[in-house]
């Protein structure tokens, strides 16, 4: 049986490397999108471990956290952070929203987002025993 949890975590590691590369190149909107992806895939790893099945094909981080066993364990700061990441997924793909979102991003803000994303991913890996 394939390691479904490992599959999602491997994707997280690949996306983290990409997010760091994008930040170095000051591709801030794309970096923020990848941070959303990392959080999403981290939560999907938890769901895969919990259910033994493929996670739902949704992108809402709060809904994914609720379907996992981590929602009740999220600090207010982490919950707020997941909410902050929300707009970087779907909205970042549409031209009408891209410019508005891009205006809110600075290198300093993106450095913080990347750091918090890495911390969240690490926290999930610890919870999963990885």
Regions found by a protein language model. Give the residues of each.
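Terminal alpha-helical segments
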Residues: 1-130
């Amino acid at each position: 049986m394939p390691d479904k949890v490992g599959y999602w975590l491997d994707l997280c590691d690949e996306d983290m490397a990409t997010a760091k590369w994008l930040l170095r190149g000051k591709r801030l909107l794309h970096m923020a999108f990848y941070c959303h992806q990392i959080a999403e895939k981290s939560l999907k790893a938890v769901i895969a471990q919990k259910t033994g099945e493929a996670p739902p094909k949704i992108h809402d981080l709060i809904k994914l956290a609720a379907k996992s066993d981590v929602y009740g364990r999220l600090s207010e700061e982490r919950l707020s952070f997941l909410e902050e990441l929300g707009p970087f997924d779907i909205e970042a793909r549409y031209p009408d929203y891209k410019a508005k979102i891009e205006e809110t991003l600075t290198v300093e803000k993106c450095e913080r987002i990347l750091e918090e994303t890495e911390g969240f991913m690490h926290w999930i890996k610890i919870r999963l025993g990885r």
